[in-house]
């Protein structure tokens, strides 16, 4: 409970100030970004946190989660509102699968969109996707943010 307290108190305060219908939160269970290890009880932490946040009636919960389908299903069962789900590294042929299955109301594609400035055109034309380069994330320069090629660049 103590590990979840800040997130719950912050979400509660924001919802009270601007309205729960204008408040959302993003969680990244099982993220190992920058060597984070949330410990053996992290699944229980997220179950508790999502159940508490659900009671606030927030606009949506945004989960970024690469694996552990059982945990995703558990969190979905605890969250009655809108769910935005991001699956980093998800293959293109699985885009839309979480919506089609009813697991999520919306899917997000952060890293894929970042690496493909013409993302919509690539989807519409079934064009190839640029792979994202995580080594450029948060690097302090424009490398990795504005230098990915478009389909037109590749054709030239």
Model-derived regions, located:
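Flavin-dependent oxidoreductase catalytic cores
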Residues: 1-156
């Amino acid at each position: 409970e103590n590990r979840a307290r800040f997130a719950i108190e912050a979400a509660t305060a924001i919802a009270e100030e601007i309205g729960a219908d204008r408040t959302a939160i993003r969680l990244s269970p099982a993220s190992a970004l920058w060597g984070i290890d949330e410990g053996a009880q992290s699944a229980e932490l997220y179950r508790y946190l999502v159940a508490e946040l659900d009671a606030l009636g927030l606009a949506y919960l945004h989960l970024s989660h690469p694996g552990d389908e059982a945990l995703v299903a558990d969190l979905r069962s605890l969250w009655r509102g809108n769910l935005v789900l991001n699956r980093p590294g998800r293959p293109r042929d699985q885009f839309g699968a979480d919506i089609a299955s009813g697991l999520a109301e919306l899917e997000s594609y952060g890293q894929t969109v970042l690496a493909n400035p013409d993302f919509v055109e690539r989807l519409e034309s079934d064009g190839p996707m640029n792979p994202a380069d995580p080594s450029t994330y948060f690097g302090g320069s424009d490398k990795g943010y504005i230098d990915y090629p478009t389909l037109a660049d590749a054709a030239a």
